[in-house]
Amino acid sequence: MNIAKYIDHTLLKADATKQDIKKICDEAREQGFYSVCVNGANVAYAHSLLTGTDVKVAAVVGFPLGAMTTEAKVFETSDVIAKGAQEIDMVINIAALKEGNDAEIIKDIKAVVDIANGKAIVKVIIEACLLSQEEKIRACQLAKEAGAHFVKTSTGFSTGGATVEDIKLMRETVGPEIGVKGSGGIRDLKTALAMIEAGATRIGASASVSIVNDEKDNTAGY
């Protein structure tokens, strides 16, 4: 397995400088990561560094709370796509989900999917650590119904990250048709492989270089 191709090499800290963004883009190029995942303000710079490579640029939208209006998420999506984003990782309106407002959730996701249509794929972050089992299932069902290309466990900025149990549940819920991304707290090869075995088709990580080096060490001599 080439674990690098599963990885969105991620840097979403508020104090990430241009130098930091250049570092993750250089690493992504060298290691062959699937993408880099950055905040909107860093999309244009990351795109300029990765043009002509296979590495995609993913941008977060409505991040990390998901608690802005749909119109704001749509504008943000349109803006980052114009600046070079090929993937969108958006956060759902978690309160609307907890209130049972399924129509609002679908409207919110579908608006982003529609504006991204043909230009970027959309991953929907459900922030699983804040949800009950029933809410996790419903969030995944609604994301799939709204046309999302992936469901994603976590922002990495809340009370918990990805778990194998959540990945299994999410994969069982959405079936084979769309992707499942584990993100938050995946810092070593063993954890990354456990997520993939449970059904993840993408991994979000900041410790990506360490994960890939673990894989190289494990296969050395074979």
From Swiss-Prot:
GO terms for molecular function: deoxyribose-phosphate aldolase activity. Belongs to the DeoC/FbaB aldolase family. DeoC type 1 subfamily. HAMAP family: DeoC_type1. GO terms for cellular component: cytoplasm. GO terms for biological process: 2-deoxyribose 1-phosphate catabolic process; carbohydrate catabolic process; deoxyribonucleotide catabolic process. Its EC number is 4.1.2.4. The active site is at D89 (proton donor/acceptor), K152 (schiff-base intermediate with acetaldehyde), K181 (proton donor/acceptor). Pathway: Carbohydrate degradation; 2-deoxy-D-ribose 1-phosphate degradation; D-glyceraldehyde 3-phosphate and acetaldehyde from 2-deoxy-alpha-D-ribose 1-phosphate: step 2/2. Its main location: cytoplasm. It catalyses: 2-deoxy-D-ribose 5-phosphate = D-glyceraldehyde 3-phosphate + acetaldehyde. It is found in: Cytoplasm. It holds the Pfam family DeoC. The gene is deoC. Gene3D superfamilies: Aldolase class I (3.20.20.70). Keywords: Cytoplasm, Lyase, Schiff base. CDD domains: DeoC (cd00959). The keyword Cytoplasm applies. It comes from Alkaliphilus oremlandii (strain OhILAs) (Clostridium oremlandii (strain OhILAs)). This is Deoxyribose-phosphate aldolase. Catalyzes a reversible aldol reaction between acetaldehyde and D-glyceraldehyde 3-phosphate to generate 2-deoxy-D-ribose 5-phosphate.
